[in-house]
């Protein structure tokens, strides 16, 4: 399945919640009606079956992290092999993706922009350039912006927006140096309560 390149707000309306696909400069609810789906008959939201709810939750999380279907299923399989709660394991694996860590540190305004920064070799991990968005970041790894990329206006703008948001407790960022430490893998309580990962586990367990 190809990566979605259409309107970002359309996806948020489809899922009925902010997927954080836009920069966050202004509130998303001022730009679109999240309570109604996109399209001519968007106001009429169908009543979803149990399977429909599970599918929607999977699509929502997949879109939040910008992961394709095959990648997402592989993350689930890995999460199921690990000890502990499969749903929590899944979210933690997604949180350790390099593009997501770059976003959490505020170097990219969105995960899509962060993914582009990684792909364009603007990001280093422990002093080495890494251009694989799915690269798994480990606890205590240091993520930084390459010196020649630090003048990019979009990175500076992203850091300004990030300064207005509540900072994640599991990363430590020096905005002046454009460098951050991934202190630990986040706990479930650190992450969005609007995600119901158990629905995804039920979907893939069938």
Curated annotation (Swiss-Prot):
Chain ranges of the S4 RNA-binding domain: 96-156
One term of GO molecular function: rRNA binding
PROSITE patterns to which the protein is assigned, alphabetical: RIBOSOMAL_S4, S4
Gene3D superfamilies found in the cross-reference section: Ribosomal Protein S4 Delta 41, Chain A, domain 1, RNA-binding S4 domain
Keyword list, A-Z: Ribonucleoprotein, Ribosomal protein, RNA-binding, rRNA-binding
Keyword rRNA-binding applies: yes
Matches recorded under InterPro entries: Ribosomal_uS4, Ribosomal_uS4_bac-type, Ribosomal_uS4_CS, Ribosomal_uS4_N, S4_RNA-bd, S4_RNA-bd_sf
CDD domains the record matches: S4
Family: Belongs to the universal ribosomal protein uS4 family.
Subunit description: Part of the 30S ribosomal subunit. Contacts protein S5. The interaction surface between S4 and S5 is involved in control of translational fidelity.
NCBIfam families cross-referenced by the UniProt entry: PRK05327.1 (NF003717), rpsD_bact (TIGR01017)
Official protein name in the record: Small ribosomal subunit protein uS4
Organism: Shewanella oneidensis (strain ATCC 700550 / JCM 31522 / CIP 106686 / LMG 19005 / NCIMB 14063 / MR-1)
